[in-house]
Amino acid sequence: MGSGPIDPKELLKGLDSFLNRDGEVKSVDGISKIFSLMKEARKMVSRCTYLNILLQTRSPEILVKFIDVGGYKLLNNWLTYSKTTNNIPLLQQILLTLQHLPLTVDHLKQNNTAKLVKQLSKSSEDEELRKLASVLVSDWMAVIRSQSSTQPAEKDKKKRKDEGKSRTTLPERPLTEVKAETRAEEAPEKKREKPKSLRTTAPSHAKFRSTGLELETPSLVPVKKNASTVVVSDKYNLKPIPLKRQSNVAAPGDATPPAEKKYKPLNTTPNATKEIKVKIIPPQPMEGLGFLDALNSAPVPGIKIKKKKKVLSPTAAKPSPFEGKTSTEPSTAKPSSPEPAPPSEAMDADRPGTPVPPVEVPELMDTASLEPGALDAKPVESPGDPNQLTRKGRKRKSVTWPEEGKLREYFYFELDETERVNVNKIKDFGEAAKREILSDRHAFETARRLSHDNMEEKVPWVCPRPLVLPSPLVTPGSNSQERYIQAEREKGILQELFLNKESPHEPDPEPYEPIPPKLIPLDEECSMDETPYVETLEPGGSGGSPDGAGGSKLPPVLANLMGSMGAGKGPQGPGGGGINVQEILTSIMGSPNSHPSEELLKQPDYSDKIKQMLVPHGLLGPGPIANGFPPGGPGGPKGMQHFPPGPGGPMPGPHGGPGGPVGPRLLGPPPPPRGGDPFWDGPGDPMRGGPMRGGPGPGPGPYHRGRGGRGGNEPPPPPPPFRGARGGRSGGGPPNGRGGPGGGMVGGGGHRPHEGPGGGMGNSSGHRPHEGPGGGMGSGHRPHEGPGGSMGGGGGHRPHEGPGGGISGGSGHRPHEGPGGGMGAGGGHRPHEGPGGSMGGSGGHRPHEGPGHGGPHGHRPHDVPGHRGHDHRGPPPHEHRGHDGPGHGGGGHRGHDGGHSHGGDMSNRPVCRHFMMKGNCRYENNCAFYHPGVNGPPLP
């Protein structure tokens, strides 16, 4: 119309000649003119006006004329446009108009209007539009169902007329037509239900074969040759085969009941088109269970293979009811070839296939895929000449060859000579050299410019033109509600402060004092004299360095030694004066600047020199080789306990025997199995001899483990009662460490026990006990002895003995014993001996026994050091009773096993890697590995 706005009243005035008072179109000619005006309408007002005119028109002739002229296609265009632009009011008006028009199935096939309406009914956003589209779809479905029931009868009549012309040439034709007509008129519902029951009751191959034979037993009687084909065709519900067989059977005789039964599957399709679901749903059970049923029934595939030629045509014609006309055409071509009669029979086969297009229409409507071209062409082809069908079928199956001139094709392309040339190959060396010189110069300039970073302006700055922008049409945020929400929110919260500057300059410099970096020397020699290192000997006071000025750093070995000595009290010499540790260290180290500490440690005899100098001062006790004790032996540094504690709780002392671990269990730890553990019962030490199993010697002291006399497997006996008379039992004293008359006790390291008269005490190194008459003392010291007393000789010393006394001889010595006396075991042990007592022989020694002394029961010690004494099987372990008279032979103790003690000779063990790498070990004397020069001879 015009480009300006349209007034609907003016438009209606122009159309007044074609409309009556109610707005309805008067005549058929008027609707064609209105349609021509509708094609030119572009505005929504004019289109809605024309749609309302159509809604007011009631005459079906006028509406049909509008559809025939092309109004339905025009409405399709308007519907597509409004759907793409999502114009809801126009869509509603178009749907109302479509609902008002008398559309048929043929009209619906012309375009995709039905598809668009179906999509609107499912995916439209507007609820009213969705409801309107669904109502329109349901109305169209009702139209499709009603027309699908009426079309088969009309098309059958047309076919009968066409076939009636050829009745003269085909005498068999009237018989089949009469039978088909009578069957269609008698019972259409029965014919529709029977094939349905066949499909539903026999989903599997095996079942279907049995039921098919039961239902069609009379039909098998006249045709025995084709029994197998009958089963296959019935099973798949194939129509052309029964038709062909019926034509052969019906020629000799009239209509027989078997012939009628064979025809029943033929005409089920035209009658079944009234119910769409019956056609579409039944094949699903066959498809779903076909695989399992094929496994259950093996003979069916064999039948197919044998009768392949006969079964081929029905299988090709089988999908015709479901797929449409295209699949039936090749099947009809085969029966027409052998005889002149089959072309007419092919038309009979097409008769049930003609109503297929109406059946497909509702299916396409349901899936919103209505195609106008394919559905419209199929009903046109169905009444056509069968020769055209066969001709089309042959064209589809024919193989065409190209002409002679087109058999060969030539393709020409231009060859690029430089296509396969190696571009990396240097052709001209002079040019390559120039390029390399230029690249080097460029790289040099770039590096120089980047190093100095002198950037200069090469292009003068030109101020750009100011742009004059038009004022914005809409002020940003004019209708924003968020700014009010944020303003309300900021009223009740703290303001957010951002302290960073607005300018991108450098930040304010922070004041700080520059501190020179600390120089960490890589070589230790450089730092020897710069930073003095003070070695702290004791927590209370600091000991000076060896040179008096604190200039040198102690080696790790000496540092550990000084720390271990500083843990206990300061050692005292025999005269009671203190030992000057600084003098010892100065003599060991020599001048601090002469040799670095690392070089001193590398000397093989360095540790031996330290020991030789420290042993006479009493810092390390007896030497490791002199009496079999390790450095820091009984009462050594820190007085460490080197045996597993007993059940009653340990009380560390130099001897765990008499008066040793005091508690409820006074007898030390339980003995291990005879096999011995590798830690506490190691191999025999050649330097110290085998384990001693002697008489009533000392209990297990440091580095000793008491052993039982009965093989070591028996549990320890209950602690015996305390006896004070005549020395009591050598295994006990009172729990508080006080000895009775004649009793004795071995005091722990750092303890000073109170002793009664006649008692004896084995004292730890560095202590001087007060002894009463008859008292005795541990190794390494010369105690003051009363009459009848005895003393424990130090390593390499011969103690002075009183009458009736006994000594504990040092290692390698044969002590002289008085009459009735007893001798303590070697190695710094002092057994408690009363008059008439006995002795526990030292490991590997054969003691000299005086009169009245009884040797160990069953023990024959060896004279040569390094041998292991035999096991002593005497009274129970840790138990020997002191007798009053002489001649007592005690037993039941197992002495010190050689080669397994901590701090002893560990040369047969692996070397401690901590000691070798760092020069010291955190376990010190308790380490179970070999420290060369400390717990064994130095490495060669």
Swiss-Prot record:
Cellular localization per UniProt: Nucleus; Chromosome
Location of the region described as Necessary for interaction with PPP1CA in the Swiss-Prot/TrEMBL record: 357-433
Composition bias type Basic and acidic residues, residue spans: 153-166, 174-196, 861-886, 894-903
Domain named TFIIS N-terminal: residues: 73-147
Modification Omega-N-methylarginine occurs at: 665, 693, 738
Modified residues (Phosphothreonine): 256
Compositionally biased intervals (Gly residues): 540-551, 565-579, 725-763, 786-844
Biased amino acid composition, Pro residues: 644-655
Region (Necessary for interaction with PPP1CC): 393-408
Spans annotated as Interaction with TOX4: 1-348
Interaction with WDR82: region residues: 418-619
Compositional bias ranges of the Low complexity kind: 325-336, 676-690
InterPro entries xref list: TFIIS/CRSP70_N_sub, TFIIS/LEDGF_dom_sf, TFIIS_N, Znf_CCCH, Znf_CCCH_sf
SUPFAM superfamilies: CCCH zinc finger, Conserved domain common to transcription factors TFIIS, elongin A, CRSP70
Zinc finger (C3H1-type) stretch: 906-934
Entry-annotated residues carrying Phosphoserine: 313, 382, 398, 545, 591
Molecular function in Gene Ontology: DNA binding; enzyme-substrate adaptor activity; protein phosphatase 1 binding; protein phosphatase inhibitor activity; protein phosphatase regulator activity; RNA binding; zinc ion binding
Chain coiled-coil ranges: none
GO CC terms, sorted: chromatin; nuclear body; nucleoplasm; nucleus; PTW/PP1 phosphatase complex
Keyword vocabulary terms for this entry: Chromosome, DNA-binding, Isopeptide bond, Metal-binding, Methylation, Nucleus, Phosphoprotein, RNA-binding, Ubl conjugation, Zinc, Zinc-finger
Effect noted on mutating residue 140 to A: Abolished interaction with PPP1CA, preventing ability to regulate transcription-pause release and transcription termination
Function: Substrate-recognition component of the PNUTS-PP1 protein phosphatase complex, a protein phosphatase 1 (PP1) complex that promotes RNA polymerase II transcription pause-release, allowing transcription elongation. Promoter-proximal pausing by RNA polymerase II is a transcription halt following transcription initiation but prior to elongation, which acts as a checkpoint to control that transcripts are favorably configured for transcriptional elongation.
Subunit and partners: Component of the PNUTS-PP1 complex (also named PTW/PP1 complex), composed of PPP1R10/PNUTS, TOX4, WDR82, and PPP1CA (or PPP1CB or PPP1CC).
Free-text note regarding domains: The TFIIS N-terminal domain specifically recognizes disordered sequences in protein substrates that are then dephosphorylated by PPP1CA (or PPP1CB or PPP1CC).
Protein known as: Serine/threonine-protein phosphatase 1 regulatory subunit 10
Organism: Homo sapiens (Human)
